[in-house]
């Protein structure tokens, strides 16, 4: 199965430009994500209008050969970026990423492609929950320890058949959009694959120091 990666850069980042463009460990989250995705797939960056010029400027001087930039319709929310990305894709399967997850584990995109080849229609990397999970009452008093054996943390990137993602996007016209919630609401079966213990969602610039430390401990592609 050949997949195309879609990387949305929605309007919300117009108020949080550091989360896209500010360097962490020498590389911006945008370039780090594109570099990791391009190692396994063609990449379509689908960007809201106010951020389009900055994204184009950030790519200048990078030696990307499999990356295209498309501009979403207004108002440029995540769902509109995904629609624009899908319109630019000519493969039957796609991988969707989120810039708030700036590190992508080695082999994750390949594992997604394998699951899609085996006829999964929605594929998401996940890891077991290892923290102790507690239940509390309305007053904040701890009442029980929950069984975590069936709990998973779901990560990015996420794979879909292009038709299924288009169906989910078409149903959701505006507002916050999460592919997992949309798939579950639509009754779409979701296949989980092995995720990455070091993948995490970060809030930049707040978490920049932590992210830099994490990057320093893992085998990261060299800056080019």
What are these regions (language model features)?
Residues 40-41, 91, 119-122:
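Short, high-confidence coil segments that cap the C-terminus of an alpha-helix
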Residues 1-10, 33-36, 179-180, 197-199, ...:
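SAM-dependent methyltransferases
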Residues 1-54:
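N-terminal glycine-rich phosphate-binding loop and ensuing alpha1 helix
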Residues 99-103:
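Acidic metal-phosphate-binding loop of nucleotide-sugar-dependent transferases
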Residues 61-94:
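Short phosphate-binding loop-to-helix
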Residues 104-194, 224:
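Conserved core of the sugar-phosphate nucleotidyltransferase
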Residues 55-59, 112, 133, 211:
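Hydrophobic packing residues within well-ordered alpha-helices of enzyme cores
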Residues 30, 85, 97-98, 128, ...:
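Residue-level signal for inorganic ion chemistry
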